[in-house]
Amino acid sequence: MKILKKLKKKLEKEESKILVDTSVLIDYFKKRRLEELGGEAISIITAVEFIRGISEHKQEQVLNIFKELFEIVYIDEEIIIPFSKIYRQLKKRGMLIDDADLYIACTAIIKNYPLWTKNKKHFERLKEFGLKIYDK
């Protein structure tokens, strides 16, 4: 019985991806452990933030690595309403975060992926909107 429960938990975990934030991506890249994140997801915003910070001659190569390793989640019309609602609420409270981080958080909320970030405190204010923060 215990073995079945463990197997079920493992399968459930494997089915649910994690949205990796730029801060975690940079950390793993610097440690040359990027492949350990393979199979997870990144926002197109994360890809842009990361690639703009590396030398131009490496950008195409890194983008191809990202395409191989990750599900790249694009921004589409599904994000418009949730982004706008959360933005208004945060603005009203004087708790705005920059648009790029809000896009990343809304992507995680819409896809129901926990967000793995090193900036947990920064994203905490979005938990009430359904953001789950992954804690390794």
UniProtKB/Swiss-Prot annotation:
UniProt domain PINc: residue ranges: 18-129
Binding site residues for Mg(2+): 21, 101
Keywords, in A-Z order: Hydrolase, Magnesium, Metal-binding, Nuclease, Toxin-antitoxin system
Pfam families, sorted: PIN (PF01850)
InterPro entries, alphabetized: PIN-like_dom_sf (IPR029060), PIN_dom (IPR002716), PINc/VapC_TA_RNase (IPR051749), VapC_family (IPR022907)
Top enzyme class: hydrolase
Entry EC no(s): 3.1.-.-
UniProt cofactor(s): Mg(2+)
GO molecular function, one term: RNA nuclease activity
Record-annotated membrane-spanning stretches: none
Protein role: Toxic component of a type II toxin-antitoxin (TA) system. An RNase. Its cognate antitoxin is VapB1.
HAMAP family reported for this sequence: VapC_Nob1 (MF_00265)
Protein family: Belongs to the PINc/VapC protein family.
Protein name: Ribonuclease VapC1
Source species: Methanocaldococcus jannaschii (strain ATCC 43067 / DSM 2661 / JAL-1 / JCM 10045 / NBRC 100440) (Methanococcus jannaschii)
